[in-house]
């Protein structure tokens, strides 16, 4: 699964358009700074792995990142940084669409801690 903010989603765009490589995402804008990668060097390999694994790529609405980050913090108890709002949004969407099935084990990567 690839999850990106709709403010910077070059991998999702390439995946949805069945492209073999990513294009530079001009005017990238996201509060999830760790995911602000408008020109991923490994775009080709990411897309190849997604294709070979029957993966999926989804975007999270930039306007929902803060609330999704807070929802994750309350539910899981980890004071994660805003990037988790993208991850949590994708998890909720894929669970709702039954792409993630009930009882399936899922690992959500929270790679940053909020500094206060």
Show where each model-derived region lies.
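Active-site/ligand-binding loops adjacent to catalytic centers
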Residues: 2-80
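Phosphate-binding loop/pocket of nucleotide- and phosphate-handling active sites
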Residues: 23-26, 85-116
């Amino acid at each position: 699964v690839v999850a990106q903010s709709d403010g910077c989603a070059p991998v999702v765009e390439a995946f949805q358009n069945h492209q073999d490589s990513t294009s530079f995402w001009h005017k990238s804008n996201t509060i999830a700074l760790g995911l602000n990668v408008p020109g991923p060097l490994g775009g080709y390999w990411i897309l190849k792995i997604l294709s070979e694994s029957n993966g999926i790529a989804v975007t999270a609405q930039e306007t929902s990142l803060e609330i999704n980050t807070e929802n994750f913090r309350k539910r899981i108890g980890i004071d994660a940084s805003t990037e988790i709002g993208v991850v949590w949004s994708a998890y909720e969407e894929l669970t709702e669409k039954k792409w993630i099935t009930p009882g399936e084990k899922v690992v959500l990567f929270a790679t940053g801690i909020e500094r206060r």
